[in-house]
């Protein structure tokens, strides 16, 4: 069948309106940038080939340059592993299908995004990037002789359901005003929040809530996705089967689901993870939107921990769960470092709230894994623009305890 298909090349760009309509737009004086990431079905229809099969994801761009100077768009800033048009088209070449091969080459080349943007022009095209699921991060740089502009996007990708997209406070708190806090009351309010996540009934404590994030005006996912975090799939039959398959064959599953935990009577609003090359190992974070704001910016509370293995359990419907590393302060520090390295942090600090649990008297989570902690929560204030590492403010609040001798 693949031999016969190599003689056929029937792209259908008539359906491009679906991804163009959901394109995100950002602008600077004299410049407008529209971007959209294609899902697997959209790219197959538009390009006539199953690009997702080869881990390729086209990203559509439309850039209006109304300035008086030429701008340069380097695609490598958007995706360091992007493909050339010929690299993509050659994957679908047939041995004897000369006419179809030539048509593929010309079609993919014609649609490739140009990197030179003349003054007073509108340029459209595609960057052939590496496949991402759930969301795709795009860092776009436009450079001229007298200016450099950067734009950061977190683009939704059509496909299976993920935990945490388009979250609105009024969906969770329709009858309650969001309380806007100043810095001092932010500290005291979140130091008094419940120590831990719970089960669905709120009768048992789970993993500790060791993280507070104050978002910026832009999408709070930007610093996470920029550092290689992925949204987690929603836990359902399909994702459970894929998880089991990855476990049995020792494969990676970058978007594997997380077990639901509860705060404010609901499961996590957002679940992110940074996985290794095996399903058994990952750092993951769950976040809940709170009924509080800081200077008009939404505030989240969450937990971060590190999975170091997978084991069977009778406490989950899919009979498997991850085992967490007991030193959760290490993982709190890892996430903080990762966000600092993204550049999208303006200040950070630590506050009370969890309650200390030494290694000699650890607590357990809902699946029986032990953990110990100094009892602090990290608080991170995100920013819209990148901040040099040395210019990031550290709040003079609590100080994390050094690792105890008994835990070494």
Please place each PLM-identified region on the residue numbering:
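Short, hydrophobic/aromatic beta-strand segments
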Residues: 69-77, 138-140, 221-225
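Short, solvent-exposed beta-strand/turn "edge" segments of beta-rich domains on protein surfaces
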Residues: 43-62, 66-70, 116-118, 201-202
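The feature marks short-to-medium sequence segments in extracytoplasmic or secretory-pathway proteins
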Residues: 66-118, 123
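Terminal, regulation- and interaction-focused segments at domain boundaries
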Residues: 193-223
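A cross-kingdom signal targeting lumenal/periplasmic-facing segments of multi-pass membrane
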Residues: 57, 235-404
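Surface-exposed edge beta-strand/loop patches
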Residues: 3-9, 81, 111-174
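Second-shell loop/turn segments in exported
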Residues: 45-50, 65, 113-114, 206-213, ...
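Low-complexity, acidic Ser/Thr/Pro/Gly-rich terminal tails and inter-domain linkers that flank the onset
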Residues: 8-54, 190-192
């Amino acid at each position: 069948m693949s031999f016969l298909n190599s003689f056929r090349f029937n792209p259908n760009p008539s359906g491009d309106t679906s991804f163009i309509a959901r394109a995100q737009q950002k602008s600077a004086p004299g410049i407008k940038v529209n971007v959209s990431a294609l899902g697997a079905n959209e790219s197959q229809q538009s390009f006539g080939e199953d690009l997702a099969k080869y881990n390729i994801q086209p990203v559509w761009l439309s850039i209006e340059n109304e300035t008086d100077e030429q701008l340069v768009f380097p695609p490598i800033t958007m995706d360091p592993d992007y493909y050339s048009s010929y690299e993509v088209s050659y994957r679908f070449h047939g041995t004897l299908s000369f006419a179809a091969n030539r048509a593929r080459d010309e079609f993919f080349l014609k649609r490739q995004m140009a990197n030179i943007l003349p003054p007073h022009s509108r340029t459209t095209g595609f960057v052939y990037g590496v496949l991402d699921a759930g969301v795709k991060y795009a860092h776009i740089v436009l450079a001229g002789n007298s200016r450099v502009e950067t734009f950061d996007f977190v683009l939704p990708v059509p496909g299976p359901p993920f935990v945490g997209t388009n979250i609105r406070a009024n969906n969770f708190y329709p009858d309650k005003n969001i309380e806007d806090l100043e810095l001092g009351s932010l500290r005291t309010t979140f130091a008094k929040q419940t120590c831990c996540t719970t089960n669905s009934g709120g009768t048992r404590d789970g993993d500790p809530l060791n993280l507070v994030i104050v978002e910026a005006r832009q999408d709070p996912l930007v610093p996470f996705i920029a550092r290689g975090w992925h949204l987690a799939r929603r836990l359902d039959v399909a994702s459970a089967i894929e998880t089991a398959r990855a476990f049995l064959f020792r494969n990676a599953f970058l978007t594997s689901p997380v077990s639901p935990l509860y705060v404010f009577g609901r499961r996590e609003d957002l679940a992110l993870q940074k996985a290794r090359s095996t399903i058994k190992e990952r750092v993951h974070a769950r976040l809940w939107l709170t009924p509080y704001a800081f200077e008009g910016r939404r505030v989240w509370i969450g937990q971060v921990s590190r999975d170091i293995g997978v084991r069977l359990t009778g406490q989950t419907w899919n009979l498997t769960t991850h085992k967490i590393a007991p030193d959760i302060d290490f993982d709190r520090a890892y996430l903080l470092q990762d966000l600092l390295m993204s550049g999208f942090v303006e200040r950070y600090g630590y506050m009370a709230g969890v309650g200390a649990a030494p290694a000699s008297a650890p607590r357990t989570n809902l699946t029986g894994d032990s953990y110990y902690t100094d009892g602090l929560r990290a608080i991170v204030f995100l920013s819209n623009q990148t901040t040099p590492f040395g210019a990031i403010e550290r709040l003079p609040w609590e100080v994390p305890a050094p690792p105890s001798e008994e835990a070494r």
